[in-house]
């Protein structure tokens, strides 16, 4: 859902829609029409809800229903690491410590002592705030960069 997030800078607020411009609700409505399969193309969805395509694309990755967020169970993170023994294992241990369930690990061959790893895991049973877990992983030794790639 959210591509290329810089979670360390992102801030999330829960706001009553009555104080927001209608455009945000319309973006959500367009997303829901597409997700439900009622409308197949974005052009049609934005026409039905009354917003422009550019408005839709501007906000689609930043506006969510609370119910949409609470249903997120799987996340994909991309981690760039210094290639050192035990680094990936420590990251996996950290996720497991807070009751994250590892689903897949995709690791590229290290080049110039740098490795890229994508980790998909279930966060439905996490006993720590998700952003806090990402901050802890990001602060670990040999972690160069961490990006949130997707939530589902």
Curated annotation (Swiss-Prot):
**InterPro entries, alphabetically?**
ACT-like_dom_sf, ACT_dom, UPF0735_ACT_dom-cont
- Coiled-coil annotation: which residues? none
UniProt cross-references to CDD domains, sorted A to Z: ACT_PheB-BS
* SUPFAM superfamilies assigned: ACT-like (SSF55021)
Q: Which PROSITE patterns match?
A: ACT
Instruction: Give all residue intervals belonging to the ACT domain.
Output: 76-151
UniProt lists the family membership as follows: Belongs to the UPF0735 family.
Q: What is this protein called?
A: UPF0735 ACT domain-containing protein CTC_00116
Source species of the chain: Clostridium tetani (strain Massachusetts / E88)
């Amino acid at each position: 859902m959210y591509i290329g997030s810089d979670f360390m800078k992102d801030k999330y607020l829960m706001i009553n829609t009555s104080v927001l411009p209608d455009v945000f609700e319309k973006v959500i409505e367009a997303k829901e029409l597409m997700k439900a399969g009622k409308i197949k193309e974005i052009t049609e969805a934005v026409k039905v809800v009354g917003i422009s395509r550019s408005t839709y694309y501007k906000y689609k990755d930043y506006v969510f229903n609370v119910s949409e967020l609470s249903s997120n169970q799987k996340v994909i993170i991309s981690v760039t690491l210094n290639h050192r023994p035990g680094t990936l294992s420590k990251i996996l241990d950290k996720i497991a410590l807070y009751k994250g369930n590892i689903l897949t690990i995709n690791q590229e061959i290290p080049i110039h002592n740098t490795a890229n790893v994508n980790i998909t895991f279930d966060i439905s049973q996490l006993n720590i705030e998700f952003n806090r877990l990402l901050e802890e992983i990001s602060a670990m030794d040999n972690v160069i960069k961490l990006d949130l790639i997707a939530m589902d």
